[in-house]
A protein has these predicted regions:
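Catalytic cores of transferase enzymes with a strong primary signal for eukaryotic protein kinases
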Residues: 55, 62, 142, 146-150, ...
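Conserved PLP-binding active-site segment of the aspartate aminotransferase-like
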Residues: 168-174
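Short beta-strand
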Residues: 160-165
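Conserved core segment of the aminotransferase class I/II
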Residues: 72-144, 148-152, 157-159
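Active-site pre-lysine segment of PLP-dependent enzymes
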Residues: 2-6, 18-89, 98, 104
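Short, well-ordered beta-to-alpha junction loops that form the rim of enzyme active sites
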Residues: 15, 52-53, 166-167
Length: 174
């Protein structure tokens, strides 16, 4: 209902900050169907921007589905600062799904936006280090251990809490 004729993109975050919700394949399929339907109705594609800095922090062995696998007009944003435990480092990428309408223009436009808004390249040493760590992750199990401890304590105190499926956030009902 909130997607109107002027809607050009929808932004999602999975696993979600601050709730820790991980969107299921079923949810992403339904979202893709709605975006496809609305795109046809309005005569223009609606892009899906998927913000995925917490992709590698999922609990209970849960696999986080790739939203780009469900919808062709997806831009994926990723940050290494979470998966490699590099707090404060702003190093990541934006990927345009191959075949996405206007993919060449989008890539050029993102490069220009990055320059105009003052985003600078991270230090060379960080770029080189991350380049060599593509198949490596930090021990992220500490986040699940901490989440379980905090979840158990909060619920024992009577707080209503949705058990997070990922991230290092927990969102008690106020």
């Amino acid at each position: 209902q909130m997607i109107g004729e002027k809607t050009t993109c929808v932004l999602i975050n999975t696993p979600n900050n601050p709730t820790g919700v991980v969107y299921s394949a079923q949810t992403l399929t339904r979202m893709a169907d709605i975006l496809t339907e609305k795109s046809k109705a309005f005569g223009h594609n609606i892009f899906l921007v998927s913000d995925e800095p917490y992709r590698d922090i999922a609990f209970d062995g849960k696999k986080v589905p790739y939203p780009a696998a469900f919808y062709p007009h997806t831009l994926t944003c990723f940050s290494y600062s979470k998966s490699l435990s590099l707090p404060g480092e702003r190093l990541g990428y934006v990927a345009v799904r191959p075949g996405c309408e206007g993919e060449d223009i989008l890539v050029d436009m993102m490069a220009q936006i990055s320059r105009f808004t003052g985003h600078n390249c991270p230090p060379s040493i960080i770029q080189r280090a991350v380049g060599r760590c593509q198949e490596v992750t930090s021990d992220l199990s500490v986040y699940e251990t901490n989440m379980n401890l905090l979840y158990d304590k909060l619920t024992a105190l009577g707080f209503e809490v949705e058990r997070p499926g990922g991230t290092f956030y927990i969102f008690p009902k106020a």
